[in-house]
UniProtKB/Swiss-Prot annotation:
GO terms for cellular component: cytosol. GO terms for biological process: negative regulation of DNA-templated transcription. InterPro entries: TR_Rrf2-type_CS, Tscrpt_reg_Rrf2, Tscrpt_rep_HTH_NsrR, WH-like_DNA-bd_sf, WH_DNA-bd_sf. Its cofactor is [2Fe-2S] cluster. This is HTH-type transcriptional repressor NsrR. Signal peptide: none annotated. The keyword Repressor applies. PANTHER family: HTH-TYPE TRANSCRIPTIONAL REPRESSOR NSRR, WINGED HELIX-TURN-HELIX TRANSCRIPTIONAL REGULATOR, RRF2 FAMILY. It holds the Pfam family Rrf2. Nitric oxide-sensitive repressor of genes involved in protecting the cell against nitrosative stress. May require iron for activity. Residues 2-129 form the HTH rrf2-type domain.
């Protein structure tokens, strides 16, 4: 299963925010600069992350973005569930004439659930704690 770039950059943005001291604000511009992604694309991602409570956005002169809850409470599987379209195949009867008898969708759904269950074993904190090489790459001191 390949994650969409939307989910990929969502995870990267969260990783960046998790690498900052807890509660510290950053900006969308800073995140886009670190990862070299379009600002418009990142705005959409941050808006979605904010809607589901994973990011807090504060407007104004001293505003910015930060994690919506502690990194050790944000499971990677939950992030993927919020950002990723998880349907692997189009099983509508208009698209596939074997849909009424097909068992593949159930197998694929079980595989996706196993994938997500594995991701649930890890939090953002697991991705950043004691990860000096990551801090150096992100220019976080």
């Amino acid at each position: 299963m390949q994650l969409t770039s939307f989910t990929d950059y969502g995870l990267r943005a969260l990783t960046y925010m998790a690498s900052l001291p807890e509660g510290q604000m950053t900006s969308i511009s800073q995140v886009t600069e670190v990862y070299g992604v379009s600002r418009n694309h990142m705005v959409k991602i941050i808006n979605q992350l904010s809607r589901v409570g994973l990011v807090t956005a504060v407007r104004g002169k001293n505003g910015g973005i930060r994690l919506g809850k502690p990194a050790d409470q944000i499971r990677i599987g939950d992030v993927v569930r919020q950002l990723e379209p998880l349907s692997l195949v189009n099983c509508s009867s208009d698209f596939c004439h074997i849909t009424p008898a097909c068992r593949l969708k159930q197998v694929l759904n079980q595989a996706v659930q196993s994938f997500l269950n594995e991701l649930d074993n890890y939090t953002l904190a697991d991705m950043v704690q004691d990860n000096t090489p990551l801090y150096k790459l992100l220019f976080v001191e």
